[in-house]
Amino acid sequence: MAREYPLNKVRNFGIAAHIDAGKTTTTERILYYTGRTHKIGEVHEGAATMDWMEQEKERGITITSAATYCRWQDMQFNIIDTPGHVDFTAEVERSLRVLDGAVVVFDSGNGVEPQSETVWRQADKYGVPRIVFSNKMDKVGADFFMVVNDIEEKLGAKPIPVQIPIGAESSFQGIVDLVTMKAHIWSGEELGAKFDITDVPKELEEKAHAARSEMIELIADYSDDIMNNFMEGKESTAVQIKQAIRNATLQIKLIPVLCGTAFKNKGVQPMLDAVCDYLPSPLDRKAFKGINPVTSETDSREVDDKAPFSALAFKIQADPYIGKLTYLRVYSGTLESGSYVYNPIKDAKERISRIVRMHSNNREEVKSVNTGDIAAAVGLKNTGTGDTLCDEEKPILLESMDFPVPVIDVAIEPKSKADEEKLGIALNRLSEEDPTFRVRTNEETNQTIIAGMGELHLEILVDRMKREFNVQANVGRPQVAYRETIRKVQEAESKYIRQTGGRGQYGHVVLTVEPQDPGKGYEFVNKIVGGVIPREYIPAIDKGIKEAMTSGTLAGYPVADVKVVVIDGSFHEVDSSEMAFKIAGSMAFKDACRKASPVILEPIMKTEVIVPEEYMGDVIGDLNSRRGKIVSMESKNKVQHIKANVPLAEMFGYSTTLRSLTQGRGNYSMEPSHYEEVPSQIADKILERTTRG
């Protein structure tokens, strides 16, 4: 299919922020003003186009990232609206991995909030240029310049206001564009679709000129043209200023900051213009680097329709009508429906039966997609999240994505025999969709354990099982997802020999286990020389170790952060098999861990508590009693923002305690930070509990 828009006219961007900052409301206005929808869907009415899941409509929150596309001026926008709740941070992670830019929405009354910091770090990790939309300028306490200061102080970024507000709170009318020095004023009619562009109001002239001078000084550091004009006392043109801001934004040196109120329909159109002016096209991201899976050397792909095809699968979604949808970002080349693609991770070819472009949960079938496009493919049975798809003749392996480890476990069992098979299908389908949702079996109790990022995450998934898969299940109380690791290097040897007439079984493995840095995960190293164990049996040893890691030797929790090195062994010409080496590897690993000073790890939560100052002492005392470590305290408008690291095990039921301590005036948020060794007295209680029950 011929390209509709040249690549430099394409913008792939996401809308991201803390929960309740107004991301989905902003996206709904974008769809309305670009003509993609003909009426505005409101989140609080359960009518938002992008919140299509029943759970999203009922709760008024975004749970899954939703893709859409629209046109603005002479540009094509591919947009992903992401969740703001910390339990669904994986949706943000996978979206930012494949997007070229982002609009980060802040609440003008609250500034930079905890989940905003997480989103910012994720965008930094993938080098995503961004602009900021300071939303809710109409709310009580709205302060545009507080948001600007927060971006600098809390995020360590260089904000550059390219607008200033006209009024605030109930008197917010519009914005002054500091580049053109024109005012945009909304009268409130026609749902904000029309506004007046006028001269800067007299009472704001001095403030606007001062803000513009600051803006020019800031961008002069990143533009020779602007610096020369500044030194010579010349006025820079709007075109020069926009180009300078664009260049600095693409290098993530500056962050343009705009403002408005999406709910009151003010300020959205200038923000769309800023997406065109300042965020990158696929061409601005240059050639994409990867690894050649054949040679293991660095390779790259030009951002060009004529280059060999390469794409990243970033999301899997079960569709009740057409089966499994695999969302793709095309990095190079062209993909046609009916063609075959190569998956270097799985070393398999798969056929794309259909290609669809998504508008929330609606599909529009297309014959092909080109470089820079975001679409969904039907027919890929073996492709998972983070897999590369490419041309088999010119293979490449693109950078995948990392997902956080689940922190909460829940036991689940079917209510009846009829539900048993349906539960298995549901768990398999949901874990395929969501990389932060894990399923395992407790070897001691034979219970099925599901793990996720928080209570809300698991609650939503259980609800989906009931609604989408018609599974009735009993769910236990949420438990902390403890992990086990080791504290010293240990060698172990295991022989698996069975002789029961006919062909026997023989596998012999010698290995060492070593502690890894926290968060580094599992590493497998093969140091077998001279063929003492044939090469074809090495993957079986790795598989056996991975299976053994699901249940540690201390208390049966999954093992984390361990390096395993296979150093020796032997085989039998007739009796050796993959199964024998898998069992021998598993036995050797368990034996080594048992002797390597195993310890229990617990998830630590990065917690922020916001309380009126008069309750601060009680709240800090309570956090200390929960083994919390206070990181910082900040006073803002007679309200204390307390940041602390607290073990998740101590945070169950915290909302009730906080309500009681602050007479209902406190609130808090928390997100997984890292795992730490459990203090010995707590570990003893955990071990006692697991052995008893």
Swiss-Prot record:
Keywords: Cytoplasm, Elongation factor, GTP-binding, Nucleotide-binding, Protein biosynthesis. InterPro entries: EF-G-like_DII, EFG_II, EFG_III, EFG_III/V, EFG_IV, EFG_V, EFG_V-like, G_TR_CS. One of its GO terms (cellular component) is cytoplasm. CDD domains: EF-G (cd01886), EFG_III (cd16262), EFG_mtEFG1_IV (cd01434), EFG_mtEFG_C (cd03713), EFG_mtEFG_II (cd04088). GO terms for biological process: ribosome disassembly. SMART domains: EFG_C, EFG_IV. GTP binds at residues 17-24, 81-85, 135-138. Catalyzes the GTP-dependent ribosomal translocation step during translation elongation. During this step, the ribosome changes from the pre-translocational (PRE) to the post-translocational (POST) state as the newly formed A-site-bound peptidyl-tRNA and P-site-bound deacylated tRNA move to the P and E sites, respectively. Catalyzes the coordinated movement of the two tRNA molecules, the mRNA and conformational changes in the ribosome. Belongs to the TRAFAC class translation factor GTPase superfamily. Classic translation factor GTPase family. EF-G/EF-2 subfamily. This is Elongation factor G. It comes from Endomicrobium trichonymphae. The lineage of its organism: Bacteria, Pseudomonadati, Elusimicrobiota, Endomicrobiia, Endomicrobiales. The gene is fusA.
